[in-house]
Every structure is written in structure tokens, then in C-alpha cells.
């Protein structure tokens, strides 16, 4: 998270927790016409999977946080507030969140290139808490990436496990007229005499 996003997360976290929810992280996206402030919320880990985040939860957080932002005013200028569930491709904002998803695949974007790359995709192997780093298996090799160098990270959903993998058609689709692949022949059609 950016410094501004971290500041806002620290400010709003207790408000979200007071509603019985968890603030996973904040995205602050400044733009010339007005910034976007996106909050990702979820139910506490202890209540999963019995309870999931819903639209009512997002609306409650939006109302409470909006009022707090009006009073505290941490953002100058216009902005749009969005409150969202993390979704199946959930973003990861903290080392604890990476630790919850060890064994799953993720894609990450770095602030500064490492090994000539800024984008990596691989399986989360472990968290090195002493080094404040995440170890990924990328192309069969372990790669350690400092948490402070991670700009963005998202879980890659396992669509097969979710039962949402694209299905291959069992039979070919209908033929389009005029697209017959047979080559024209000078032979007469069977049973028809050739006109002389």
C-alpha cells in the first residue's frame, strides 16, 4: 500500500472493526478529476466460511466511513469511495495475509525490478518473517521478494477447484454455409450423367 493508503487504513481500521468486520487493505488512486479510495473488507477469519461479506456489510461500512472521512478529512479534493469484498482474486496487503494463503498461486507487481523483472506469478511457499519477505516458487525456482518491494499482489483463483473452469465443447459447432472444405472436382456427381 502507498503511504497515503496506509495512513487511511490506520485511520479507518478501528471503525470497520467496530462493525464486526476486517479491513483487509486500502487502495488510494489519485487522478486529475478526483481520486478513488477503495476499501476491501471481509468477515473476520474466525467466522469464515460460515459467514460471507455481503452488500449490506459494504453499505454499512460505506456510511460509517463516509461520516468519519468528512470529519477527519485525510484526502484533499474530490474522491470516490468504494467499499468492496475481496472477491476470488483477493488482493493481499500484509504479510499475515500472504501467510494465510501459503500454497496458493499469486501474481505480484514490484515497485523496483528484481532479477530484471517487475511482474511475477507463482505459488506462495512461505513467509520469512525475519527478513520481512515472501518466498514464491516461480518457474520451478524459489524467489524471495522483500515485502516492502511489493506494489500489488493478488491471489490467482483455482478455477478448476471452484468448478468454474471453461468447458471444452464435446462436439464441433454447426457448419457455416459456404465454408465446406471439400475441393471442387471435375468428376460428375454420383448417379448424374455428365452433360456433353
UniProtKB/Swiss-Prot annotation:
Query: Tell me, what's a Pfam family for it?
Result: RimP_N
| Example of a GO biological process term | translation
> Mainly resides where?
cytoplasm
Q: Which Gene3D superfamilies match?
A: Ribosome maturation factor RimP, C-terminal domain, RimP-like superfamily, N-terminal
Disulfide connectivity for this sequence is: none
Provide ranges: composition bias, Basic residues.
Answer: 173-182
Q: Where is this region: Disordered?
A: 164-196
Question: CDD domains annotated for this entry?
Answer: YlxS_C
Localization:
Cytoplasm
Recorded GO cellular component terms are:
cytosol
| Entry keyword set | Cytoplasm, Ribosome biogenesis
What this protein is reported to do is described as:
Required for maturation of 30S ribosomal subunits.
Question: What family is this protein classified in?
Answer: Belongs to the RimP family.
Q: Which NCBIfam families match?
A: PRK00092.1-1, PRK00092.2-3
Q: List the protein's name.
A: Ribosome maturation factor RimP
Amino acid at each position: 500500500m502507498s503511504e497515503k493508503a496506509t495512513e487511511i487504513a490506520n485511520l479507518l481500521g478501528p471503525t470497520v472493526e467496530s462493525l464486526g468486520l476486517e479491513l483487509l487493505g486500502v487502495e488510494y488512486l489519485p487522478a486529475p478529476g478526483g481520486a478513488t479510495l477503495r476499501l476491501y473488507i471481509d468477515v473476520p477469519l474466525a467466522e469464515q466460511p460460515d459467514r460471507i461479506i455481503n452488500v449490506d456489510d459494504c453499505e454499512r461500512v460505506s456510511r460509517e466511513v463516509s461520516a468519519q472521512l468528512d470529519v477527519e478529512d485525510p484526502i484533499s479534493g474530490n474522491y470516490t469511495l468504494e467499499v468492496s469484498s475481496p472477491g476470488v482474486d483477493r488482493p493481499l496487503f500484509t504479510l499475515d495475509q500472504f501467510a494465510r494463503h501459503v500454497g496458493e498461486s499469486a501474481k505480484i507487481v514490484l515497485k523496483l525490478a528484481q532479477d530484471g523483472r517487475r511482474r511475477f506469478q507463482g505459488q506462495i511457499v512461505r513467509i520469512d518473517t525475519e527478513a520481512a519477505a515472501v518466498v514464491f516458487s516461480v518457474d520451478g525456482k524459489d524467489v524471495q521478494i522483500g515485502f516492502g518491494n511489493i506494489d500489488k499482489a493478488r491471489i490467482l483463483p483455482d478455477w478448476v477447484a471452484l468448478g468454474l473452469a471453461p468447458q471444452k465443447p464435446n462436439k464441433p459447432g454447426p457448419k457455416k454455409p459456404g465454408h465446406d472444405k471439400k475441393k471442387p472436382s471435375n468428376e460428375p456427381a454420383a448417379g448424374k450423367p455428365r452433360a456433353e
